Amino acid sequence: CDAPTHYCTNYWECCSGYCEHSHCW
């Protein structure tokens, strides 16, 4: 994704919402 809000802990996913247990919600 272009401009992620933050990254998840272990998998470095693009997150635009919450990070729960190392994946995006």
From Swiss-Prot:
Q: Where are the transmembrane segments?
A: none
Regarding tissue, the record states: Expressed by the venom duct.
Q: Which UniProt keywords apply?
A: Calcium channel impairing toxin, Disulfide bond, Gamma-carboxyglutamic acid, Hydroxylation, Ion channel impairing toxin, Knottin, Neurotoxin, Secreted, Toxin
Q: What are its GO cellular component terms?
A: extracellular region
* Key word Secreted present: yes
Report the residues modified as 4-carboxyglutamate.
Answer: E13, E20
Disulphide bridges: C1-C15, C8-C19, C14-C24
Top-rank taxon of the source lineage equals Eukaryota
- Protein's cellular compartments: Secreted
GO MF term set: calcium channel regulator activity; toxin activity
- Which positions bear 4-hydroxyproline? P4
- What job does the chain carry out? Micromolar concentrations of PiVIIA increase the magnitude of the macroscopic calcium current in DRG neurons from rat. An increase, even modest of the calcium current, may have a significant impact in the excitability and electrical activity of neurons, and may set up PiVIIA as a member of the pharmacological family of the gamma-conotoxins.
Domain statement? The presence of a 'disulfide through disulfide knot' structurally defines this protein as a knottin. The cysteine framework is VI/VII (C-C-CC-C-C).
By sequence similarity, the record places it as follows: Belongs to the conotoxin O2 superfamily.
Other notes: Negative results: does not modify sodium, potassium and acid sensing ionic channel (ASIC) currents.
Protein name per Swiss-Prot or TrEMBL? Gamma-conotoxin PiVIIA
Supply the source organism for this entry. Answer: Conus princeps (Prince cone)
